Amino acid sequence: MKNSQGNEVAVTNYGGAIVAIMMPDKDGNYANLIQGHDNIQDVINSPEPFLSVLIGRYGNRICDGKFTLHGKEYQLARNNGKNHLHGGPTGFHTHVWDATR
């Protein structure tokens, strides 16, 4: 996506990964501000699975992968030692998204 000033954002549909944010420096030279992956294979195979992608359904760690709501205990998948992290192994970072302008 590019705005009228020439600033640009590139996002993949896999995990909503931000690939590039192109902005000018003080001299008008455009550069990518994102430290991330160069291609979709790098996103999929990354040892840093949450780098520049959407996280969720929950953000951060849920201790022991469980919580209680209205007196009922829920157990979530554990993907960070004993904890549930950023939506677990099937979080938003693993989904293919549809996008419209």
Please report, for each region that a protein language model flagged, where it lies by residue.
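Surface-exposed acidic/polar loop and edge beta-strand patches at domain peripheries
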Residues: 2-101
